[in-house]
């Protein structure tokens, strides 16, 4: 029988951790080489890992030096490159090495496949710690490994777009990336996340930031056109439209790379690689919630919904019977 965890003061410890200021420092000196650092955001399940693994593989085939970093706590960004095998994460490895009194080496966390260099930042276990702070800590460890001295043409960062805390917004908030790419489909949920990312970019542009949105990759495109309409309204280009193809789905499920000149989809990913490299960072025009919903309106008459305020009696239900007053009433004398 295992001992029950000690939760005394757990809430206070979490608050203290959240209140700490990140220590990650961004070098202020001019870069010595032109490396494109690109942050890719999208809703969970939108196909970020599939798109990035195949994009990075195609870039490597085209002679580019590419580093793919998974910044999603699921730590599955790079698994497609390694036939389904998960890389040991930077945070997990650093913890084990620290307990053993050893230093983390590049070879412990960075691995090669098809010419692509790949690693996973990782994150805390479920219910233990903050995923955003895990991202910050992971980049601090990358700094110690010499991240800014590495020689790459492209560094691709895969970020979860559903979470809005500061750690996941680090590339936007601190100008760590030159540009952002969003992944979306023709569904409201994925475009809602893409619009939130555009909102974050616009917010930090107003504060003097330089990061812009280079475009959107439409994944699982079924031809209904909502994602194309979103891109047009927000003012960002479509970098590629990956079709909703059953063969592509099977290849992805079997951890097979399709971003290669040896496959029928090679030309699609070659064009995507060129567009990603050449697309400039743009200032988006994020949509209001109503404008986003309007993209999905049909030709039928728009349904008008009134917001009816609830009352205290509504919320109490069967307990809403009037209570007897405790007021003392005196007889007239």
UniProtKB/Swiss-Prot annotation:
Essential cofactor(s): [4Fe-4S] cluster
Q: Which InterPro entries match?
A: BchX, NifH/chlL_CS, NifH/frxC, P-loop_NTPase
- A Pfam entry, by short name: Fer4_NifH
Which residues of the sequence carry a binding annotation for [4Fe-4S] cluster?
Answer: 130, 165
GO terms (BP aspect): bacteriochlorophyll biosynthetic process; photosynthesis
User: Where does the record place the region Disordered?
Assistant: 1-22
- Name the residues that bind ATP: 45-50, 74, 219-220
Chain residues that bind Mg(2+): 49
What PROSITE patterns does this protein map onto? NIFH_FRXC_1, NIFH_FRXC_2, NIFH_FRXC_3
Q: Which reaction does it catalyse?
A: 3-deacetyl-3-vinylbacteriochlorophyllide a + 2 oxidized [2Fe-2S]-[ferredoxin] + ADP + phosphate = chlorophyllide a + 2 reduced [2Fe-2S]-[ferredoxin] + ATP + H2O + H(+); bacteriochlorophyllide a + 2 oxidized [2Fe-2S]-[ferredoxin] + ADP + phosphate = 3-acetyl-3-devinylchlorophyllide a + 2 reduced [2Fe-2S]-[ferredoxin] + ATP + H2O + H(+); 3-deacetyl-3-(1-hydroxyethyl)bacteriochlorophyllide a + 2 oxidized [2Fe-2S]-[ferredoxin] + ADP + phosphate = 3-devinyl-3-(1-hydroxyethyl)chlorophyllide a + 2 reduced [2Fe-2S]-[ferredoxin] + ATP + H2O + H(+)
Its keywords, alphabetically, are: 4Fe-4S, ATP-binding, Bacteriochlorophyll biosynthesis, Chlorophyll biosynthesis, Iron, Iron-sulfur, Magnesium, Metal-binding, Nucleotide-binding, Oxidoreductase, Photosynthesis
The entry's free-text remark on the cofactor is:
Binds 1 [4Fe-4S] cluster per dimer.
Pathway assigned in UniProt: Porphyrin-containing compound metabolism; bacteriochlorophyll biosynthesis
One annotated GO molecular function: ATP binding
Name the family: Belongs to the NifH/BchL/ChlL family.
What job does this protein perform? Converts chlorophylls (Chl) into bacteriochlorophylls (BChl) by reducing ring B of the tetrapyrrole.
Q: What is this protein called?
A: Chlorophyllide reductase 35.5 kDa chain
What organism is listed for this UniProt entry?
A: Rhodobacter capsulatus (strain ATCC BAA-309 / NBRC 16581 / SB1003)
